[in-house]
Swiss-Prot record:
Primary role: Removes the pyruvyl group from chorismate, with concomitant aromatization of the ring, to provide 4-hydroxybenzoate (4HB) for the ubiquinone pathway.
Swiss-Prot/TrEMBL GO biological process terms: pyruvate biosynthetic process; ubiquinone biosynthetic process
Cited HAMAP family: UbiC
Organism whose genome encodes this protein: Shewanella denitrificans (strain OS217 / ATCC BAA-1090 / DSM 15013)
Family stated for the protein in its record: Belongs to the UbiC family.
Matches recorded under Pfam families: Chor_lyase
The keyword Cytoplasm is assigned to this record: yes
Sorted UniProt keywords: Cytoplasm, Lyase, Pyruvate, Ubiquinone biosynthesis
Protein name, entry field: Probable chorismate pyruvate-lyase
Pathway where it operates: Cofactor biosynthesis; ubiquinone biosynthesis
SUPFAM superfamilies (UniProt xref): Chorismate lyase-like (SSF64288)
Main location per the UniProt record: cytoplasm
Length: 189
């Protein structure tokens, strides 16, 4: 795998849309995965022997213009979720500075632990709405998939979910890489 910290961040300006417009997603299994409300981490772990989080980078930064729910400095973390050594999902987390001041250790010291375990096991964290996005084959994330030796023949699809802790919001974006989509098509899961 030729991903280095010099490549960080991969995130780009994204046009998110509501799940009501998900009819354009032809792959029914992918659509189900995109709209699933439970923990993606748990779902992925059930499909493999070795689940791994590979951190691409993390840092304090300004949010992108498309991250409208967050208007302050954010802690950004970008990772690959790998199943049996193969990257399946690119994930990007944005945690606002005010939430870091409130719960810094929970987020900044995850290391290679999946964030999903914290998000779906902590009663104070409330999952919010899901939004979807389509990434053309020339996007930065498609180039990431190519650098991971995954062939890009169709656009990539991803989802973004907002989570609330008190009055603060964090955002998690998950983009399904070609290896995940190929598995879904093959195994109908």
């Amino acid at each position: 795998m030729k991903v280095t910290s010099l490549s960080f961040p991969y995130g780009e300006s994204i046009q998110w849309f509501s799940p009501e417009r998900a009819d354009s997603i032809q792959n029914a299994q992918l659509k189900d995965w995109l709209l699933a409300t439970g923990s993606l981490t748990l779902k992925l772990k059930n499909l493999c022997n070795d689940f791994e989080v590979k951190v691409l980078g993390e840092q304090l930064t300004s949010p992108l213009a498309t991250d409208t729910m967050i208007e302050e400095t954010v802690w950004m973390r970008e990772v690959l979720l790998c199943l049996d050594g193969t990257p399946w999902v690119f994930a990007r987390t944005l945690v606002p500075q005010s939430l870091l001041d409130f719960k810094s250790q929970a987020f900044t010291q995850l290391g290679n632990k999946p964030l999903g375990e914290l998000l779906y096991t902590s009663p104070e964290i409330i999952p919010g709405k899901i939004e979807l996005a389509k990434f053309d084959t020339c996007s930065r994330l498609a180039k990431l998939a190519t650098s991971l030796k995954q062939e890009i023949s169709d656009p990539l699809w991803g989802r973004r979910r907002h989570f609330s802790i008190d009055t603060r919001h964090l955002t998690v974006s998950e983009i399904f890489l070609p290896a995940a989509v190929a598995h879904m098509k093959l195994h109908n899961k």
